[in-house]
């Protein structure tokens, strides 16, 4: 019905927003011979529970999905699902922002428009605004979403880009951007390194939006040493740091205290 159609549209939009991450993950599949949807036992071969939950999988390096296959109950079609969250990191519900410690099995409850989708804490996730032409539209605004990491976290994700149309990447025509998250001594540093590499149609400049779930409005935030304007966001339960259009070859360093 109408509710199911709305739920489908929301997930379709999410796919578009996640395309920088998905595209980078597919590149990793190409270079490292890994599947995009990975059984838990691929990353955690020594964990007994990795073999006990075949219905869930890692979607690239950062996301964990557990599709619901049971009927939802009640007016909101709430469905329950057991999910195993591997240890060594905190996991955040992508839709609600709720934090869960790793190393446990939890029981989730999801309405029709959601499903159990979790992201590792302390890892930069590249995203983009919704666009219908999600692969070939130039990335003129890069969204970097970072859920809080544990003390001592130091994680890097490599954003991959090419023209999205040809096989010129086989001749080395592509670009990468290092996204790094560090947390130490009560300070969080997020770094967007200069873009390396070129390809046809590559944008020379882009805007940025740093999304910080779980960060309070009163937090002190700076961008390249200057105090930054932050915007509270209720859906994220955190703040957004908008960064105006910049040359892609200039670094961006965001500090949060």
PLM feature segments, named:
Residues 1-189, 195-219, 249:
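Catalytic core of carbohydrate-active enzymes
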Residues 177-183, 219-223, 230-233, 256:
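Generic structural motif
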Residues 224-247:
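Extracellular/luminal ectodomains and secreted, surface-exposed scaffolds of diverse proteins
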Residues 244-257:
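Surface-exposed interaction regions enriched in Ser/Thr/Asp/Glu
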